Amino acid sequence: MTPDTYVDQYLAQRAGQAPTVDRLVTTPSNLDAQGMLDVIADPRLGPQVLEVLADLFRPEGSIYYDAIYGDYHGQADIRAWLIPTMALIDFVEFVPQATTEMFDDGEGGTSVDEWQMVAVLDGERIPLPKGVSVRRYRDGWITWNVDVYDTGPFRTSPDPDTPPPDLPPWPRTTWDALPASDDTPLSASARAWLDDRSEQSETATEPPGLSHEDLHSIVHHPIAGQNMGIVADLMHPTDSRYIDPLFGELEGQAAIRRWLLDVMPKVGAMRFDPVGPTLFNGRASVQEWVQTALLPDGSTVPLVRGTSVRRFADGWIVYAADYFDTAPLADPQMQQAARAAGSTLAAADIERYR
């Protein structure tokens, strides 16, 4: 089966028909991860792409998570939500921010797409939040689709006389965290660089001389990756960018360093629990996580669900994006948990960088 053949067969049966929720596909596509991506990118499908996307979800044991609407399980539930909901926002374009990254996860493949929503109204293009989609592919099916983006801007109104949109509360989805482990061991060259750096200043202007795999292993290491000075050293001096929904976008190593060293010590006792494997393909890495507050009594409170993407070029980190929803951070219960965990972040900290 090729992607073209798959689309040909679909159109032979369904061309010109409106997408329907009364449909269940029980035969796998017989396509690999790239093939399924090629299918949903086929321009011949037009608005029927939503039906085809739903067709590709495994009938049972699949999940679609959306930062506004939460989690849906199994092809039937995913289809019943996906098709009517996306039809309501057909004026929104999802503009790619980078090429799709494919990762070998040892089980069928994972893809990462970064995008920005753009509303097209009366000929005007209105930029909306950026987001990321992580999909996992298994045996001819999509089994995992998680769309993470900031819903905070959708939950407020720029006009004080206009009520905010009627949206459901932010999702309380429960995520199964993977056991904490050092799944990115450091090479001899990475350890040597870290040992040498400890004797140097905090300013990095020369390439660290490390492979992209070394850069990846350092920033995802449970100890080295928590040292914000080390992370800053690995960012390109001028051609680097860091995206954060709360603080905006920072460019260049100096600005990123100031922000990391200023803000990160104020977040309190937090743990980033992985909800998927840390993946690396030579150019980019991805990690899905839940930020968890560690309270003095030993209990924990999950705060936000996020996805982090890193990109590497010429021996530097050139791009870092942490995608998460800020809506939970406006919840009084979550704010109380963050304060109990020692967070001292204030609105002034955010305003200083945005």
Feature roles, as predicted:
Residues 35, 48-111, 228-285:
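A solvent-exposed, acidic/Ser-Thr-rich amphipathic alpha-helical stretch
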